[in-house]
Amino acid sequence: MKMLLLLCLGLTLVCVHAEEASSTGRNFNVEKINGEWHTIILASDKREKIEDNGNFRLFLEQIHVLENSLVLKFHTVRDEECSELSMVADKTEKAGEYSVTYDGFNTFTIPKTDYDNFLMAHLINEKDGETFQLMGLYGREPDLSSDIKERFAQLCEEHGILRENIIDLSNANRCLQARE
């Protein structure tokens, strides 16, 4: 009986893991990321970019999937005022990679998502001969479990982003009142 329970637990873990996808993998279904999202955590190897009044402290509201692009709707806070910002990210030649011009040239991928709860994005910005990377954890709800947040922190470390450069925004003013 114990063996059967262990087998069931093992199969459950395999199934949960198998449901996750990466935009660079064959099993990624871009249509499933369509819809409403919330910025939960931002991380960067240039922390000032995501601190208060940083140009990349953007709060994702929605992803609208088109044939070869994504329309991204964000909010930003400047002097305690919320402003809406929309941008179009186009597919690049690389599988699962998108590009967008915003404060430089940006390319990004989605290294992990389960579609229903969370999405982890990895962005590289190039401007005036300098580059930095940014990672974002986004949720279908305004907050996520500590387990998912820890997995995101580990992914950031794998990309060379230190834990002190990870900012949990779940209690920050994310312009939730500005959502339609």
From Swiss-Prot:
Disulfide bonds join 82-175. It is found in: Secreted. Binds pheromones that are released from drying urine of males. These pheromones affect the sexual behavior of females. PROSITE patterns: LIPOCALIN. Pfam families: Lipocalin. GO terms for biological process: aerobic respiration; cellular response to lipid; energy reserve metabolic process; glucose homeostasis; heat generation; locomotor rhythm; mitochondrion organization; negative regulation of DNA-templated transcription. Its main location: secreted. InterPro entries: Calycin, Lipocalin, Lipocalin_CS, Lipocln_cytosolic_FA-bd_dom, Maj_urinary. Belongs to the calycin superfamily. Lipocalin family. One of its GO terms (molecular function) is pheromone binding. Keywords: Allergen, Disulfide bond, Pheromone-binding, Secreted, Signal, Transport. The keyword Disulfide bond applies. This is Major urinary protein 6. Abundant in the urine of adult male mice but absent from that of females. SUPFAM superfamilies: Lipocalins. It comes from Mus musculus (Mouse). CDD domains: lipocalin_MUP-like. Residues 1-18 form the signal peptide. There are about 15 group 1 MUP genes and their transcripts make up about 5% of male mouse liver RNA. The lineage of its organism: Eukaryota, Metazoa, Chordata, Craniata, Vertebrata. One of its GO terms (cellular component) is nucleus.
